[in-house]
Curated annotation (Swiss-Prot):
It is a multi-pass membrane protein. This is Antiholin-like protein LrgA. Belongs to the CidA/LrgA family. LrgA subfamily. It comes from the Bacteria. It is found in: Cell membrane. It comes from Bacillus cereus (strain AH187). InterPro entries: Antiholin-like_LrgA, LrgA/CidA. Inhibits the expression or activity of extracellular murein hydrolases by interacting, possibly with LrgB, with the holin-like protein CidA. The LrgAB and CidA proteins may affect the proton motive force of the membrane. May be involved in programmed cell death (PCD), possibly triggering PCD in response to antibiotics and environmental stresses. Signal peptide: none annotated. Keywords: Cell membrane, Cytolysis, Membrane, Transmembrane, Transmembrane helix. The chain crosses the membrane at residues 6-26, 30-50, 61-81, 97-117.
Length: 143
């Protein structure tokens, strides 16, 4: 393995580690329980959108982690199996939360998609109208 690849991997691992450290610190100080991994994803997304971090700086390690994502779920699966007693005790409540959250998620996603598509449709109509007006001006038909 070339030295450049090793340094690239180490720099990507450092970026991910720094983001996770920051997200862990934030999670411990939040008044509501929120997983540090979710906070880390939001931080990484924000840094990528703001172009503080370039995609090339984290892409290959991110791709490698995505490739082994199934393996990364093993500890979560073991935790679920260890918690089956608690889950059985609160089965109805857990099932209710899952169903309600799924319905809310589907509704919000659908409404948001309709909003975006409606906005896109309006922009398309406005663009067509503007082209017609500009075309008329070129031919001296519109004052």
């Amino acid at each position: 393995m070339s030295t450049k690849k090793v340094y690239s991997f180490l720099s990507q691992a450092f970026i991910f580690s720094a983001i996770m450290l920051i997200s862990n610190i934030i999670a411990t100080h939040l008044p509501i329980p929120m997983p540090s991994s979710v906070i880390g994803l939001v931080i990484l997304f924000s840094l990528l959108c703001l172009k503080v971090i370039k995609l090339e700086q984290v892409e290959s390690l991110g791709t490698a982690l995505t490739g082994i994502i199934g393996f990364l779920f093993v500890p979560s699966g073991i935790s679920v199996i260890n918690s089956l007693g608690v889950m059985g005790q609160y089965f109805v409540q857990i099932l209710t939360v899952i169903v309600v959250a799924t319905v809310i998620l589907l509704a919000v996603t659908g409404l948001f998609a309709q909003f975006i598509l409606g906005k896109d449709k309006k922009e398309t109509e406005d663009t067509k109208e503007l082209k017609v007006v500009n075309k008329g001006r070129k031919h001296g038909k519109v004052a």
